[in-house]
């Protein structure tokens, strides 16, 4: 048993529907993110991409290819279990939830204005951090560094910041030629106590890169991961500005022009 593999996680989050559209961001599939929004709430950001070319969209194809590569990884095992009364009860409970949602949002099954309610993009590109269950090359951070080379203004939103020397060098390099702003949770407001508390140790080093740091005192923790480059590029997905996202976990980000 390779115990080191326990440390590597699949951290990307996406939903593909009928080769027509997909939803991608940082939102987990539990009650904090998808529940009734009455307790334990986290605020997040997702991107809905609607493909008008009937399955020929570049980013949609990239995402489907990525899924199949993950599915075929040697570390992936198919779980087969016998149907039990427990599963039947859960299924019935989910049906009841769906019926209640139909009452609140009666256009769930009939809504069709996807093209009208979305904004056309010049180009959407999927970037990832590698799929192997092992230490990864920091592909997402390197791509962000490349995209910001000629930028005048860069805004990074992340739940928290935990960097090593290389990552600080990247931030320093950005702030040398651009106005760099980092938006994160205040320590007392974040939902990840380990990540947010370490900010107290990291704060001086972050400020020494030349970045302006804004600590959010929202009613609810913010789980958003995004980079805005000038007034043109948005980079949104699952990548936190920390060493786990940079070197260990699978991550996906959309670059939207």
List each language-model region with its residue ranges:
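Charged, low-complexity intrinsically disordered terminal segments
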Residues: 1-13, 17-257
């Amino acid at each position: 048993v390779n115990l080191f593999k326990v440390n590597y996680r699949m951290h990307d989050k996406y939903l593909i529907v009928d080769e027509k559209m997909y939803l991608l961001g940082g939102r987990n599939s539990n009650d904090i993110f998808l529940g009734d929004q009455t307790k334990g709430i986290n605020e997040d950001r997702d991107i809905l991409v609607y493909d008008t070319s009937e399955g020929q969209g570049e980013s949609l194809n990239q995402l489907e290819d990525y899924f199949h590569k993950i599915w075929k990884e040697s570390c992936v095992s198919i779980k087969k279990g016998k149907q039990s009364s427990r599963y039947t009860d859960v299924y019935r409970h989910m049906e009841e939830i769906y019926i209640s949602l139909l009452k609140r949002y009666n256009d769930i099954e009939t809504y069709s204005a996807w093209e009208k309610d979305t904004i056309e993009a010049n180009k959407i590109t999927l970037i990832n951090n590698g799929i192997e269950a092992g230490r990864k090359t920091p592909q997402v951070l390197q791509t962000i560094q490349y995209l910001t080379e000629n930028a005048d203004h860069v805004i990074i939103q992340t739940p928290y910041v935990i960097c090593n020397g290389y990552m600080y060098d990247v931030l320093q390099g950005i702030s040398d030629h651009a106005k760099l702003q980092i938006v994160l949770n205040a320590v007392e407001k974040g939902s990840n106590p380990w990540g947010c508390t370490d900010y107290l140790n990291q704060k001086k080093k972050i400020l020494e890169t030349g970045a302006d740091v804004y600590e959010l005192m929202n009613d609810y923790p913010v789980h958003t991961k995004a980079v805005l480059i000038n007034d043109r590029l948005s980079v949104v997905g699952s990548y936190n500005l920390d060493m786990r996202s940079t070197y260990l976990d699978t991550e996906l980000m959309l670059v939207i022009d």
